[in-house]
Structures are given as C-alpha cells and as structure tokens.
C-alpha cells in the first residue's frame, strides 16, 4: 500500500508519493515527487485541477492504482477547517475561499482524505519522522517566514476548537518592537524571517543616528537591503551590529519558549528553519532566558531541539497527517 501527499503553498505546490506504513528509517519512505509553481492568477480551480493531474501522473509513472492508496494527506497554510475539509482564503491563496478540497480530492482518488494547516502538519512530520520521535507532548515552532506552532499533546495532534490552536505568533512579548502578525512587539515580530529583517532595520537606524559602525550599511539605502540571511552571515563574521540583532531575537525566543513551557509543560520543543540553521548561537542564550523566566520544574523536563527534516519537511508533513 501507498500514501499520497499534497503540499499547497502560495509559490509552489508538490504532490508526493510515499509508502503506506510508518517505518523506523525515513530513507526510502518517499518514493517519488512532482513539484510545480502555484499560478494563483489562474484561480483555485485551475491550480487544484493541476494538482489532481500531477497526482494521476505520479501514480501512473509508478504503476500504482488509486485503490492501492491508504489515503491522501493535504498540508496548506491556514485559515482552514480540517473538520469540514475546506480551505478558507489563506493570505497567499487569495481566491481559495471556502474551497471544499477534501471532498474534491476524495471523490477524484476514491480514498479517504485528511487536511491540516502547515504548522500542524509539520508538527506531525517531526513527531512521526524527525526530532520529535518518541515524545508524547511536543511543540513544533515554524520560525521561518512567520512564527506558528503545532501541538502534539498526550500523543495526539491538538487543533483546538476551530483549528486555531498554536497561533503563538501574535502573542505580545514587549510593548514596542518589530511588527509581526500585525502587532508590534509580538513573538512573530521578534522571531521570524520578516521580524528579524524589521528588527535589523530598526537597529540599523539607531546605529546611524549614534554614528556606530557596521560592515553592512552606511546609508538608508543599505539598511533597506538588510534581511535575516544577510545579517546572519555578518554575525558569523563577527559584526557587532549583526550579533546584537540576533542576540535580541534569541532573548525573545527564550521569552516565548518560557510561556509555552509553563502553559503546556511539553517534553520537547522542536524548532525549525532559522533556529535549525543557527542552533549553536541561539541555544545558550535561550537557555539563560528560560532559566530566569520559566518554572524550574517545567524547564528541567523540556528539551529544546532543532528540527531534523530540513527542506523535506513539507513532503513528510503532507504524508504524515495520514498516520
């Protein structure tokens, strides 16, 4: 038996063929994959038709019938309704309003279909296949373009009353600060790709006003070119400004983690993307903050781990929601 996964994003989509049962080793679990750009201008029907066509192509070229599938898993940015099986106009998919994707996909392939938002699906992926294997209480933080969480509580994915559990990005950690989730000083404002960019630009303006020096900028035009990747590279080259930006980001990551640790009491928090690439810098700082901010008996039982699946997480996420 086999599994089929659909990963829908604002810039690209992927259809993934996997094995039909969990295995200890992830090597070989994914059998084949087709990815293609998401042409949102064509509208949701055209994009979804292309997804279904690519799914058929994937099965055909691997000599697999749809009757051999255990199901189809779908991962997509929210808002969505996993119980009703609808996608409800995510920001990067503007005309996907109340699209009954589960019904359409189920009828096309004739098998069960499961839909979850991407943060939840990634949490399941790291829990089933990655750094979270073996834990019953786990929080996954995206820490990429945005900041969201997926929650595995008592050995099950927890979605909340209306699929909005884990929306940690909007939590305000400071009265002022970079804007994320439309809110100044939010978790996402300090701890996301866009947030680090905003934090860097705010800090750089102060540097110019105070006549401080950085390798990265001399003018306002230079400041506007700053982003999370550029600043990270400069940090590893010893730039004081870049280190200040990432230190502040790490401190607020520690504050956000302290809130999560005390509210949910998890065994582990798995953090993806930016943390995954910069763990050695972040970890000592966030440990110091957690030691000060979180209850000691909660902090002591919680591990902070980098995500393990890397760029493949979207593939495992789409397939993982089936298991």
Feature-to-residue mapping (PLM):
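ATP-binding/phosphotransfer module of carbohydrate and carboxylate kinases, centering on a glycine-rich
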Residues: 1-71, 81-84, 103-111, 125-135, ...
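Short beta-strand segments
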Residues: 7, 73-77, 140-146, 150-152
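A charged helix-plus-loop insertion that forms the helical arch/lid used to bind
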Residues: 85-96
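General beta-strand structural signal in soluble alpha/beta enzymes
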Residues: 113-117
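Structural signature of FAD isoalloxazine-binding scaffolds in flavoprotein oxidoreductases
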Residues: 164-168
